[in-house]
């Protein structure tokens, strides 16, 4: 059993989602958004760090998963997003959590079966997969998607590791 904290980073709104993985089953523990109020970026980064640190203290996750930065046409936006990610990652590292990163396309593929899915599709699938009574906020749904992706990726890697022997069989050696 492990608790996974997923993060959808943003310099204004950072989504978070926490799930518990018990074997093949996933259970919803909590989600929401860290909304920054500061006008200047350094103040927003401080709020992201403090918010993620508080979530880590509250839920005591075993692992931290975060969405990777995608290249944007707007370099300034991409840089701010990278700094927001950095603030969240530092909070995880300070709590001695292992950090895993996933591309947005992989997350959408893992959750909806379509790497080009829109936010509404992700929200609907997250709601269905975690048996939520209502559609989560878009940023929180994305963060839950990050956590689900890690749970499913980790499950696959563990299964493969159990079957791998390192020896090849057959006529080609």
UniProtKB/Swiss-Prot annotation:
Binding site for Mg(2+) 2: 67
Chain residues that bind Mg(2+) 1: 8, 139
Cofactor note: Binds 2 Mg(2+) ion per subunit.
Keyword Magnesium: yes
GO MF assignments: crossover junction DNA endonuclease activity; DNA binding; magnesium ion binding
EC annotation from Swiss-Prot or TrEMBL: 3.1.21.10
Annotated catalytic residues: 8, 67, 139
Top-rank taxon, per record: Bacteria
InterPro entries cross-referenced by the UniProt entry: RNaseH-like_sf, RNaseH_sf, X-over_junc_endoDNase_RuvC
Its job: The RuvA-RuvB-RuvC complex processes Holliday junction (HJ) DNA during genetic recombination and DNA repair. Endonuclease that resolves HJ intermediates. Cleaves cruciform DNA by making single-stranded nicks across the HJ at symmetrical positions within the homologous arms, yielding a 5'-phosphate and a 3'-hydroxyl group; requires a central core of homology in the junction. The consensus cleavage sequence is 5'-(A/T)TT(C/G)-3'. Cleavage occurs on the 3'-side of the TT dinucleotide at the point of strand exchange.
Listed name of the protein: Crossover junction endodeoxyribonuclease RuvC
Taxonomic lineage from the root: Bacteria, Pseudomonadati, Pseudomonadota, Gammaproteobacteria, Vibrionales
């Amino acid at each position: 059993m492990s608790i996974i904290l997923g993060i959808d980073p943003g310099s204004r709104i950072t989504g978070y989602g926490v799930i518990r993985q018990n074997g093949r089953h996933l259970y919803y523990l909590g989600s929401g958004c860290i909304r920054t109020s500061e006008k200047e970026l350094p103040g927003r980064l401080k709020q992201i760090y403090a918010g993620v640190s508080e979530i880590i203290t509250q839920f005591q996750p075993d692992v931290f998963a975060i969405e990777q930065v995608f290249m944007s046409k707007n370099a300034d936006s991409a840089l701010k997003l990278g700094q927001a990610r950095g603030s969240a990652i530092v909070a995880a590292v300070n709590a001695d959590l292992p950090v895993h990163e996933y591309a947005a396309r992989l997350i959408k593929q893992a959750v909806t079966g379509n790497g080009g899915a829109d936010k509404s599709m992700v929200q609907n699938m997250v709601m269905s997969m975690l048996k939520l009574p209502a559609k989560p906020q878009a940023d929180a749904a994305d963060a839950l998607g990050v956590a689900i992706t890690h749970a499913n990726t980790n499950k696959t890697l563990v299964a493969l590791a159990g079957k791998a022997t390192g020896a090849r069989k057959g006529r080609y050696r």
